[in-house]
């Protein structure tokens, strides 16, 4: 874990590049689990306070515990005591805050799924490096943010290094969805009840009564209700409507095909 005796990189800078931000993240996420938590979180705040005071950026409150509590109340949206990478980007002075750029233009689950549908061009269940580059380029244009080819390449590689949890050079849907605010990330709701390929095939076949290879939104409603009841999880009408809308963003002309739903509900995307 990062200790006070080991100076973390770049915290004193007035503005961070995307690459520098990533180095800070890796420094404090010592166990590499995708969160800064526990002692890691305490170390981060101690070092951030030191760096800001050293560079003349005094905090409003000198009370470490109070400041840390305020931060967690503001950014720890699901109150799990952990800080995610995209949340950290909101307090560090990151150049052209590229993570927030995602959130401004892919702010809801439905918009995110529409973007995923566009850039997962081969419908593999992954966005690969060349597809991600196009995704980022379009987002930067939407945000009217100037960029050049080297900067676009840096953003692409940084996002890959941030969210490519298994190091295969491509992003699965669940990995990419970490760009969404926690409260908008409907995919988190399916954690702990992912299906195997065999389980998915059985449930899809049950609801695809006419064996057409796709289901409509009403059949999806029934499928989601069944899935939640099976896993003893509660879901109200509004949640069901939101989840259905998000998943149906993957559909073509109201038809949700087996392969697209499998990306959302299975442990691994289809090969």
From Swiss-Prot:
Residues 16-51, 63-98, 107-142, 151-186, 195-230, 235-270 form the EF-hand domain. CDD domains: EFh_HEF_CR. Gene3D superfamilies: EF-hand. SUPFAM superfamilies: EF-hand (SSF47473). One of its GO terms (cellular component) is dendriole. The modification Phosphotyrosine is found at residue 214. Ca(2+) 5 binds at residues 208, 210, 212, 214, 219. The keyword Calcium applies. InterPro entries: CALB2, Calbindin_Ca-bind, EF-hand-dom_pair, EF_Hand_1_Ca_BS, EF_hand_dom. PANTHER family: CALBINDIN (PTHR19972), CALRETININ (PTHR19972:SF4). Calcium-binding protein involved in calcium homeostasis and signal transduction. It plays a critical role in buffering intracellular calcium levels and modulating calcium-dependent signaling pathways. Predominantly expressed in specific neuronal populations, influences synaptic plasticity and neuronal excitability, contributing to learning and memory. During embryonic development, it facilitates neuronal differentiation and maturation. This is Calretinin. It comes from Homo sapiens.
């Amino acid at each position: 874990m990062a200790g006070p005796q080991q100076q973390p990189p770049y915290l004193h800078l007035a503005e961070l590049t995307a690459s520098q931000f990533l180095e800070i993240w890796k420094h404090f996420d010592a166990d590499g689990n995708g969160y800064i938590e526990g002692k890691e979180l305490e170390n981060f705040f101690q070092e951030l306070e030191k760096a800001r005071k050293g560079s003349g950026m005094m905090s409003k409150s000198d009370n470490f515990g109070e400041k840390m509590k305020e931060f967690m109340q503001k950014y720890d949206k699901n109150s799990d005591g952990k800080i995610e990478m995209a949340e950290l980007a909101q307090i560090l002075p990151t150049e052209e805050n590229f993570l927030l750029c995602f959130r401004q233009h892919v702010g809801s689950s439905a918009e995110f799924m529409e973007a995923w549908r566009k850039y997962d061009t081969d419908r593999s269940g992954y966005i690969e490096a060349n597809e991600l580059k196009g995704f980022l380029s379009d987002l930067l244009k939407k945000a009217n943010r100037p960029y050049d080819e080297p900067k676009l390449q840096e953003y692409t590689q940084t996002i890959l290094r941030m969210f490519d949890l298994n190091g295969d050079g491509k992003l699965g849907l669940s990995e990419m969805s970490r760009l969404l605010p926690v409260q908008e990330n409907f995919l988190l709701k399916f954690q702990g009840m992912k299906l195997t390929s065999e389980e998915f095939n059985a449930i899809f076949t049950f609801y695809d009564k006419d064996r057409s290879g796709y289901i409509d939104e009403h059949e999806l409603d029934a499928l989601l209700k069944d899935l939640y009841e099976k896993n003893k999880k509660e879901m109200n009408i509004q949640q069901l409507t939101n989840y259905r809308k998000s998943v149906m963003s993957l559909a073509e002309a109201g038809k949700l095909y087996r392969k697209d739903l499998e990306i959302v509900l299975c442990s691994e995307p289809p090969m």
